[in-house]
From Swiss-Prot:
SUPFAM superfamilies: Putative cyclase. This is Uncharacterized protein MJ0783. It comes from Methanocaldococcus jannaschii (strain ATCC 43067 / DSM 2661 / JAL-1 / JCM 10045 / NBRC 100440) (Methanococcus jannaschii). GO terms for molecular function: arylformamidase activity. It holds the Pfam family Cyclase. GO terms for biological process: L-tryptophan catabolic process to kynurenine. InterPro entries: KFase/CYL (IPR007325), KFase_sf (IPR037175).
Length: 186
């Protein structure tokens, strides 16, 4: 069994205009306690329907994102050939720009969103800062398909493979997004 971590390390690299990461150490009764302040879309995160003004409906028990995963490459995807899976991951190669300004300048175009919406996919993830603009988000989220953004470069090792996917967001349900820890088990 092999486990691949698909999560970006939590660093102060917010989308332009989003809240920055701040960690404030406090000493309380001899202990160090850190106060962590950050936006809900910092680094690897999951978007919920509330992100686009919809009521949150989460298609996974207890909010744990798990199931059969499959990864495709944006470059060589053949239209109408979506694999049968619960979680579809899309490798764009944009993750190689992580930590640099150009990462936010590269917005992928996903020409097969209609195919994803017509499928039984419950969650789609990508190694880019976004899966698209407001309309793309709303189309997916209104069809009860959750979105994971900012996956790391390990995604390239999964292209063309099936695996078991496990994503653990914070256990907060009435929120627009949450940081999430994502792994693939091969």
């Amino acid at each position: 069994m092999e486990i691949l971590d698909l999560t970006q390390t939590l660093i102060n690299f917010p989308y332009p205009g989003d809240p920055e990461l701040r960690i404030i150490e406090k000493k309380i009764d001899g202990f160090i306690v850190s106060e962590i302040i950050m936006g809900s879309h910092l680094c690897t995160h999951i978007d919920y329907p509330k992100h686009v003004g919809l009521e949150n409906r989460i298609p996974f028990k207890d909010g744990i994102i798990k199931g059969k995963g499959y990864c495709i490459s944006l470059d060589d995807f053949e239209r109408n050939k979506l694999p049968a899976c619960d979680i579809l991951l899309i490798y764009t190669g944009f993750s190689k720009y992580w930590g640099r300004d150009e990462y936010f300048e590269k917005i992928p175009e996903i020409p097969f969103l209609d195919d994803i919406i017509k499928s039984n996919i419950k969650c789609v993830g990508i190694d880019a800062c976004t899966i698209g603009g407001f309309e793309e988000h709303k189309r997916l989220l209104s069809n009860n398909i959750l979105i994971i953004e900012n996956l790391n470069e390990n995604l390239k090792n999964l292209v063309g493979k099936s695996f078991y996917f496990l994503g653990l967001p914070l256990k907060i349900f009435d929120i627009d997004a949450s940081p999430i820890r994502c792994i693939a088990i091969l």
